[in-house]
Structure formats: C-alpha cells, structure tokens
Amino acid sequence: MSKRKLSGSAVALVTPFRQDMSVDREAIRRLVHFHIAAGTDILIPCGTTGESPTLTADEQTEIIEIVREEAGNKMLVAAGAGTNATEEAVSLASNAQKAGAQALLSVAPYYNKPSQEGYYQHYRRIAEAVSIPVIVYNVPGRTGSNVHAETILRLAHDCENIAAVKEASDNMAQIMELLASRPDDFSVMTGEDSLILPFMALGGDGVISVAANLLPAEVKQLVTEMHEGDLEKARVIHNRLRRLFSLNFIESNPVPVKYSLSLMGMIEEVYRLPLVALQPENKEKIKEELRNLGLVS
C-alpha cells in the first residue's frame, strides 16, 4: 500500500455512556455529525480520551462501526486499537480494520517498559497484520517510557504502513529530530493542544486534539492558519483557547472534557471507574471558562 499523508485537525473522541454505564450510541452519532459540520479532518474513537481501557473488545468494535457508518466518506476514521500485549494489540488492530477503521492509532506498550527494540518489534508485528495506516502513539506521561525518535524513524523507513506518529511528549528536541529526519510521506502530529502553534511552526502536520471535542471549528481554524503560514491569526486563536487547553487536563483526561460536553448538553456526565467526577472547585473553573468562550450561558 502507499501511505496516506495524515494531517489537519483530528479529534480524540470521547465515549458517551448512559447512567446504566452502557455505551450511548445515539450520543456518538450526534458527536460525529457535530464534527462533520465543523470540518474536522479525522475522527479517532476508542483512544485514551475515549476511555478505551474500560471498553470491552465488543464495545470497541461497535463504536468503530457506528462512527464509520455516520462519518461515511466525509472524514477519515482512525480507531484507537492498542495495548501492552503485542498479540492482543494485533487482535484489536485486525478487529478495528474489519469494523471499518481506515487507519489505526496504537498506543506504545505501557507498564512492561520494553526496550527500543521491543517497541520496534511490537509495532512491526501490528503493521504486518493489517493493511491500513498505523499511527504510533508515543505518550510517555501515561506509558512510563519513551519511544525514541530513532525507533520511530526506523519504523517509518522499514514498515510501509507505519504512516504517522502522535507525539504526545513535550520533548522538543525529540520533536525537532522527528520533523527534520522523517520520510516525506510520514506524518508527525502533536497530541498536545497547547503545542499546536509551536509544533506546526516547526513543520508538524497537525493535532490529535482533546479540545476539538468542544470547539472543533476553532481548532480546525488554528491548524489551517498554521498550514497557511498566518502566524498572527493563529496566535489570536491560540491565545483565546489556551486556558481551555490547560483546563482540559486539570484532572485526568477525559474527565474535564466530558464534564464540559455534559454542560453543553451533548452527553451525560458519566464515567467508568476508576475515573470519577471532577472536584467541585474544578467544575467551577471549567464552567467559568466555558461561559467566557460562549459555550454555555
């Protein structure tokens, strides 16, 4: 296969639940159409923001099927499909492809802390098991260890369908090495909303965003201004959204963003344990900022 260049504004979709803890299928459909209207480029269900660790394999498959059905050909669906056991990750990836995913986001193995060679072999095994693009998800803050730039670049060169990395570290030296040394058809996207502007100023391709759950058109516009080289317009958008970017992580993601969506009337405020509701003082901070942004009254 030829790599598809992945770029633009991707949203790490939340997974809405009902009060009985079941997946809220109708809310998922509403969210997809919200993003179609806003011009989001890529939908990513079943990732970290989608509470994937608490979803069963059957639930993940159904969510991907719903998102793909509703999205149609209007945007790319890149499903989260990763874990720290390689063969289980392969199974999740294969099931996601069968469910209609057009690309995969696969988190770096966590807890067992593999060597760089272990990371390489893990991703190579996944890439060989599917025929769609694979996005390496490097998030040291959650996994406890870092996939080095050299390992990511080796995968990009050796594996035809290792198409991108979601770089969710704040290691600017690593980011610059990836951007300077990557193949032309390999995408580097940030996983940090607060870094969209500097990241793309260095040549990054876009963002896999949490904030886009709330303000998809604005995040898309920020990415577009950076692609078009209008730093001044991008700076205005960044400064307007920067407090929201921070508040989305005032407690563990996705709790803050799901609370915000509940205030906006888009989902119920339900989390699966071990995630729990925000502290009252943090709810007030988020409410205040949503009012400032005109998202709630």
Swiss-Prot record:
Domain of life: Bacteria
First-listed, main subcellular location of the protein, grouped into a coarse class: cytoplasm
Compartments it resides in: Cytoplasm
Catalytic activity: L-aspartate 4-semialdehyde + pyruvate = (2S,4S)-4-hydroxy-2,3,4,5-tetrahydrodipicolinate + H2O + H(+)
Signal peptide annotation: none
InterPro entries in the record: Aldolase_TIM (IPR013785), DapA (IPR005263), DapA-like (IPR002220), Schiff_base-form_aldolases_AS (IPR020625)
Pathway(s) of this molecule: Amino-acid biosynthesis; L-lysine biosynthesis via DAP pathway; (S)-tetrahydrodipicolinate from L-aspartate: step 3/4
Pfam families: DHDPS (PF00701)
Annotated site residues (Part of a proton relay during catalysis) in this chain: 48, 111
GO cellular component terms, A-Z: cytosol
Enzyme class, first EC level, given as a word: lyase
EC number: 4.3.3.7
Single biological process term from Gene Ontology: lysine biosynthetic process via diaminopimelate
UniProt keyword annotations, A-Z: Amino-acid biosynthesis, Cytoplasm, Diaminopimelate biosynthesis, Lyase, Lysine biosynthesis, Schiff base
Ligand binding (pyruvate): 49, 208
Assembly description: Homotetramer; dimer of dimers.
Known function: Catalyzes the condensation of (S)-aspartate-beta-semialdehyde [(S)-ASA] and pyruvate to 4-hydroxy-tetrahydrodipicolinate (HTPA).
Family: Belongs to the DapA family.
PANTHER family reported for this sequence: 4-HYDROXY-2-OXOGLUTARATE ALDOLASE, MITOCHONDRIAL, DIHYDRODIPICOLINATE SYNTHASE
This protein's name: 4-hydroxy-tetrahydrodipicolinate synthase
Organism: Chlorobium phaeobacteroides (strain BS1)
